[in-house]
Curated annotation (Swiss-Prot):
Disulfide bonds: none
Ranges: WD repeats: 3-42, 48-87, 92-131, 137-176, 181-220, 239-278, 290-327
Keywords: Repeat, WD repeat
HAMAP family hit by this protein: ciao1
PANTHER family with a match to the protein in the record: CYTOSOLIC IRON-SULFUR PROTEIN ASSEMBLY PROTEIN CIAO1-RELATED, WD40 PROTEIN CIAO1
Keyword Amino-acid biosynthesis: no
SUPFAM superfamilies, alphabetized: WD40 repeat-like
Tree of life domain: Eukaryota
UniProt-listed Pfam families: WD40
Protein name per the record: Probable cytosolic iron-sulfur protein assembly protein CIAO1 homolog
Any one Gene Ontology cellular component term annotated for this protein: cytosolic [4Fe-4S] assembly targeting complex
Role description: Essential component of the cytosolic iron-sulfur (Fe/S) protein assembly machinery. Required for the maturation of extramitochondrial Fe/S proteins.
Protein family membership: Belongs to the WD repeat CIA1 family.
Length: 327
């Protein structure tokens, strides 16, 4: 799917999977929909941002689309009228905003940026957004924010090689755990469907699986204090030749997909009898030359377990159908 006039940074499916949004260096958002057997660009959203649009996030209801930009703002687009309109611009970051994500309830929005901060916004009535907290836990550029699939717990990853988790404690948000293990920038993170595990990918060319251990857990992992402790339980290395820019854990199939600077996309499957405390994964598919340049973003379809969207520095958006091998 072509149309963007510069690199495409991010793709995001609407919650029902009927629509795909993409954004990039041309300062536009494209909304793609299916007509017959073909996907076509239905709408181009312009005039919201002055610089590159880096990230997109749909609200759980599918009515709102948030866009994060290098112009230091986040725009909220709504389609209540049937057409997308920018109804709010969130300002506060000092420079590039790198990522945006809505909480499962739709009542909170998180953003992060090059200014090393994570912002949490409360969605008010009448399309107003109020900053609830600004968190300075990372020591470098924050690459991505992702909400837990069922709880109001936020995760972020950074150029400082760490992943951090946050929760609200007595009316203020604070960091409740720091996950260390990657040896270079952590580019992306994704929760599994239960929210008990996180997958991360890095400039160190590895994928890591982290598992949560609450206080009093059955496994006997010592947890000091009241907060859940996360531990790295698996490292997938040797599969990627260059930086891994994005990773997505399918909430439908449980498959993990990666997007890399070696122009490939890869799919990993957990072994059938895998021990959750020491899980094992197999590489089940590699699409070489998926794009002619870096693959920046990868996203499983929210309903159809075999469909994936990707985008790249080559200016294209692609849809893939993954056919699992017969067991």
């Amino acid at each position: 799917m072509t149309g963007h006039e510069d690199r495409v940074w991010s793709v995001a499916w609407s919650p029902n999977g009927f629509v795909l949004a993409s954004c990039g260096g041309d300062k536009t958002i494209r909304i793609w929909g299916k007509e017959g057997d073909k996907w076509i660009c239905k709408t181009i959203l312009e005039d919201g941002h002055q610089r590159t649009i880096r990230s997109l996030g749909w609200s759980p209801c599918g009515t709102f689309l948030a866009s994060a930009s290098f112009d230091a703002t986040t725009c909220i687009w709504d389609q209540k009228s049937g057409e997308f309109e920018c109804n709010a611009t969130l300002e506060g970051h000092e420079n590039e905003v790198k990522s945006v994500d809505w909480s499962v309830s739709g009542s909170l929005l998180a953003t992060c940026g090059r200014d090393k901060s994570v912002w949490i916004w409360e969605v008010q009535e009448d399309d107003e957004y109020e900053c609830a907290s600004v968190i300075h836990s990372h020591t470098q550029d924050v690459k991505k924010v992702v909400w837990h699939p069922t709880k109001e717990i936020l995760a972020s990853c950074s150029y400082d090689d760490t992943i951090k988790l946050y929760k609200e404690d007595e009316d203020d948000w604070s960091c409740c755990d720091t996950l260390e293990g990657h040896e270079s920038t952590v580019w992306s993170i994704s929760f599994d469907g239960s929210g008990d595990r996180i997958v991360s990918c890095s400039d160190d060319k590895t994928v890591r699986i982290w598992k949560s251990y609450p206080p009093g857990n059955q496994e006997g992992v010592v947890v000091s204090g009241k907060h859940t402790k996360w531990k790295c339980v698996c490292v997938l290395s040797g599969y990627h030749d260059r930086t891994i820019y994005d990773v997505h854990w399918s909430k439908v199939s449980g498959l993990i997909a990666t997007a890399s600077g070696d122009d490939c996309i890869r799919i990993f499957k957990e072994d059938t009898n895998s021990d959750r405390n020491q899980p094992s994964f197999q590489l089940v598919a590699t699409q070489r030359k998926a794009h002619s340049m870096d693959v920046n973003s990868i996203c499983w379809h929210p309903k159809d377990e075999n469909i994936l969207a990707t985008c790249s520095d080559d200016g294209t958006v692609k849809l893939w159908r993954f056919t699992p091998a017969e067991e």
